[in-house]
Amino acid sequence: KRLWGMEEFSFQKPITKNYTYEYLFHNLLGHVGLAKVKYFFINLHLNDQDLGVYAVEESFSKEIIERQNRRNGPIFSTKDELGEYFPNIAFELYSESYWKNQYPKLISDLFSILNNIKMAKFHVNDYFDMDKWAKYFAIMDLTGAYHGALIKSVKLYYNPTTALFEPIGYDFHKGAGIFGGFIIMDFLQEETKDSKTACSFICGHKEWFLRFLEKENGELNNKFIKKYIEYLIEYSDEDFVNNFLKKYDK
């Protein structure tokens, strides 16, 4: 059975993910054509008791994918208890029993690919959708919600149509860290005392972002960077921001 078009979801106090910020970020991802979970607010009543306003957050399932006109595909995450700093991470799979029973060869291959991303010679352009990841990181720069850009937060959806991994945003936690004028591309600069201050708590996650910014041979990954800069320019335009906000001006 489904409620609000979802099979699984959780209730959270709005303060858990900084009130309306999380709501706006999820809808911003949908606004630019990225996969997103449902996240909205309700007045929650339990046994005739008014508990006030709660956030409803969708869990990861095929409904997320199919609602956005994509073919159902496996969604991966990292195991927080085994490490959160790339490359010292391990991956896990949502709906694991289903996928391993129905598509054992595919899942084995995908785990191999994801484990190989931790290796220096990994060809990220061959396995990750550069257009969608460029959009995603540009949105993180626009909003400063860098917690959602970390590998421990973002979920990896394998699109069987394109045979590429796409991001599904999660755990943005706006307000964590002070970044000033920092953007993700600044990780390409030589590290200094000032730059380490600018990247705040994501400094330790530099290697994750360099997987997209650089090729396996250390050269610039122009396929990604070109798209990323184009989206930075587009999303930072006042008209883009105003058009988005008008949709949610209630």
Model-derived regions: residue spans:
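Active-site substrate-binding loop specific to GH73 endo-beta-N-acetylglucosaminidase modules
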Residues: 75-78, 82-86, 156, 165-170, ...
